[in-house]
Structures are given as C-alpha cells and as structure tokens.
C-alpha cells in the first residue's frame, strides 16, 4: 500500500476530527521520519509492513480520542519540540500568548523567573530560549512531569533553567522578578462538557475546586511573599474567570492589572504588579 492510498483511508477514519488530513500527515511524518512536505510530494512510495501496522495502530488510537501529542510523544511549543507524556499537560498554542506578555514586561534589571506547575517545562523553556541571561526555575508537584521537563531541558541544551519539586510555593526559598503559572482552572462541574481528548491528560493538572478557582486564588494570595517589589505575576485562567481573577489580584494588593484574550477571542491571561 502506498502513502496516497493509506492517507485516503486514514482521512475517512478521522473524519470526526477537526483537521483529519493534517493529523494523518503528522502521523505519517512521525512514522516515516520525514517532513509533511516530503509526504505530499512522494505519495506513490510504498509503506513497509511494519510502517503500515504502526500507522494503523496510531490511527485507531486517534480515532478513539487519544491526542496526537501523546501518540507521537512530542508537541511543538514556541518553535521548540517538546517531549510530552500522559503525566504532563499538552502545551497549547494559546499559552504562547503568556510567554509573549511576559517578554513585553521584562526590563534589563529582571533576572529571575519562577514557573509554577511547569509540567513539560514549556513556559520555562520558551523563556529560557529567548533570554539566556535570566535565571529560570520551573517547579511541579509531579515527579513524573519533572522528569519530562528535565529531559526537554537537556535535549534543548538550555543551561539557564532548572527544575525541582515544589507544591506551589512549598519548597521556594527565594524571591523572583516574575512568577508565572498555568494552574488547574477547570471546575469539577465542567468535566462532562469537555472534549473526550482532555480525559487523557492528568486530571490534577486540569481540575481545581471552588469552580476551578482554588489554586488560582492560592497562588495570587501567596505570590507577593516571593516577588521582589514591582515584580509581576502572570496567570492563565478559564475564559469565564477573568472578573474573579482580577478581583483576587486586587484583593491581594496587586496593581496595574490587565487581562488579555487568547487566539479564539476568549479571556485567558491576567497579570498584575506587586505594590
């Protein structure tokens, strides 16, 4: 069976997906170890038996909802190819906006950044790749996630970032110019309305009590203790949570509070400055 014939079959099996052709080509490029462009211009090439079997297994897994990032074990974020596993959230394109906003606020005096709940290390590594003079720390309460983050750091050869265990601020003993977090912010009542793909991701990195706001408030409440004066706190949150998150920032004495939308036009990021 050649690439063209397999691709047509795969697209039919993935017809319920948002972009079946793109997803089928991603799986092909992973198995054949080539670019999507190479696949497009070489569709008459025959697949080996081993390649055919692996591709069919991948298509089945995708057809029942497993995210492609977990199937191939990687996801691109901020032009970085990151390893991911079932123990880490899959980095989203919308979170790149968080990185952009942090970069817009930094100045020559900023030297230290803390990424709370780092997961695969996406935010910390994206920042480290841009500013080699910063000292960046990523923490997580999952040793499995930290293992993936460390693998990504080594693979990318980024020397100015380190990862270690901390349950939010539990093991933090210093102050930072910037603290950033993409914490769990989905409420328990929202679970049934989620796409089935999301159920493959670690629930403790997704779900938070008090309508998804428990961890967000805890972080905002404690962040001032770990920020230098005039330091910034950046939080990613749910699209209906902007007003509540802004209220928490005001309640815990932050100012210059701003919120920004994601690529879909939904409120997604709020940040404020320590007084």
From Swiss-Prot:
Catalytic activity entry: L-glutaminyl-[peptide chain release factor] + S-adenosyl-L-methionine = N(5)-methyl-L-glutaminyl-[peptide chain release factor] + S-adenosyl-L-homocysteine + H(+)
Gene Ontology biological-process annotations: methylation
UniProt: S-adenosyl-L-methionine binding residues: 117-121, 140, 168, 182
E.C. number(s) listed in UniProt: 2.1.1.297
Keyword check for S-adenosyl-L-methionine: yes
Binding positions (substrate): 182-185
InterPro entries xref list: DNA_methylase_N6_adenine_CS, HemK-like, N5-glutamine_MTase, PrmC_N, RF_methyltr_PrmC, SAM-dependent_MTases_sf, Small_mtfrase_dom
GO molecular function terms listed in the Swiss-Prot or TrEMBL record: nucleic acid binding; protein-(glutamine-N5) methyltransferase activity; protein-glutamine N-methyltransferase activity
Cited function: Methylates the class 1 translation termination release factors RF1/PrfA and RF2/PrfB on the glutamine residue of the universally conserved GGQ motif.
Recorded family membership: Belongs to the protein N5-glutamine methyltransferase family. PrmC subfamily.
NCBIfam families: hemK_fam, RF_mod_PrmC
Designated name of the protein: Release factor glutamine methyltransferase
Species for this entry: Buchnera aphidicola subsp. Schizaphis graminum (strain Sg)
Lineage: Bacteria, Pseudomonadati, Pseudomonadota, Gammaproteobacteria, Enterobacterales
């Amino acid at each position: 069976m050649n690439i063209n014939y397999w691709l047509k079959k795969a697209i039919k099996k993935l017809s319920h997906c948002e972009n079946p052709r793109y997803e089928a080509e991603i799986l092909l490029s992973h198995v054949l170890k080539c670019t999507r462009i190479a696949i497009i211009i070489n569709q008459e090439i025959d697949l080996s038996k081993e390649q055919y079997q692996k591709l069919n297994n991948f298509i089945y897994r995708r057809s029942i909802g497993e995210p492609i990032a977990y199937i191939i074990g990687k996801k691109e974020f901020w032009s970085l190819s990151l390893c991911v596993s079932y123990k880490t959230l899959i980095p989203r394109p919308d979170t790149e906006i968080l990185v952009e906003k942090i970069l817009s606020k930094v100045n020559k005096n900023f030297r230290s950044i803390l990424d709370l709940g780092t997961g695969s290390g996406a935010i910390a590594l994206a920042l480290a790749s841009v500013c080699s003079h910063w000292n960046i720390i990523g923490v997580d309460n999952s040793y499995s996630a930290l293992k993936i983050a460390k693998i990504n750091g080594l693979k990318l050869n980024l020397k100015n970032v380190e990862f270690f265990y901390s349950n939010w601020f539990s093991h933090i003993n210093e102050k930072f110019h910037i603290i950033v977090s993409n914490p769990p912010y989905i409420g328990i009542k929202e679970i049934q309305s989620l796409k089935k793909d999301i159920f493959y991701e670690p629930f403790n990195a997704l779900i938070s009590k008090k309508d998804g706001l428990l961890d967000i408030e805890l972080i905002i409440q404690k962040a001032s203790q770990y920020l230098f004066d005039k330091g910034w706190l950046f939080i990613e949150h749910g699209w209906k949570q902007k007003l509540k998150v802004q209220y928490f920032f005001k309640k815990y004495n932050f100012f210059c509070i701003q919120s920004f939308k994601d690529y879909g036009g939904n409120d997604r990021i709020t940040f404020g400055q320590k007084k």
